[in-house]
Amino acid sequence: MDHDNEYHDNMVTMLELIWGKGYMAPGGAGNVAKLLEGTSPRGRHILDIGCGIGGPAFEMARTHGAEVTGVDLEAPLIARATSDARELGLHGQCRFETVDIGPLPFADGSFDIIVTSGALTQTNDKASLLEECMRALKPGGYLSSYEWMRSGREYSDDMHYWFKMEGLTYALEQLGDYEAKFMHAGFENVSATDASDWYRAEARREYALIKGELYESMVRLLGQKDADHFVEDWRAMVVVIESGEMRQGYCRGQKP
């Protein structure tokens, strides 16, 4: 499984136009608030796994008063996040580093909270990552995750077509599978919340945006061919979201 540089610069810029500056996943500040709900983040040390270009980390620092360490597999994303942290005057609260697939490079009990938006979606060996999160958390700490998921039925032709259009590494599972894996890793007070209805409406809005007012910007950034591919990719995603085959959800657990 090779995740190296799946997101090139212009693609990142397009995602920011759709999802907001610094964000490579939907929901913006609202998604960050949902991830941190009930965790008392002020003054806490948070690990953001799959931090991308740092938008969620900056929000956690500015609005929620946390100290944040962000990690990602892709060095260009980390370089951008580090540069933006300096520019925003948040380099004292936010630091970023590139990591490889495998054990997290942190001592046991390093973090009060661990968050992720999509890291488990793109990880085949979810059990190992959950075990690492458990190890890196302090007792009483939380792991809070927002992920793209699947329904229980076999993938349709529409789903296979969307995977082809995406060209990214996905390892989708059902919401109940996440809940079971969190519990198997030793987490307590596990909760799993379906967010599919929320993102169904968001995806429709995003599709209208990229085939409408953002289209000319996409052509300038990506060229005609890639812009049209981007629009078709989003159309294909809306199809599998509308059918209920591609789903979204939150899962949270607490270390004993």
Please state what every model-predicted region is.
Residues 25-42:
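Conserved alpha-helix/loop element of class I SAM-dependent methyltransferases that forms part
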Residues 47, 53-103:
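Class I SAM-dependent methyltransferase SAM/SAH-binding core
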Residues 102-113:
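A short acidic, Gly/Pro-enriched loop at the edge of an enzyme's catalytic core
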Residues 113-125:
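A short SAM/SAH-binding and catalytic strip from SAM-dependent methyltransferases
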Residues 127-142:
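A short glycine-rich, Lys/Arg-flanked "PGG" loop and its adjoining helix->strand segment in the class I
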Residues 148-169:
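Short, glycine-/aromatic-enriched active-site segment of Class I SAM-dependent methyltransferases
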Residues 171-185:
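Short alpha-helix
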Residues 191-256:
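Conserved Class I S-adenosyl-L-methionine
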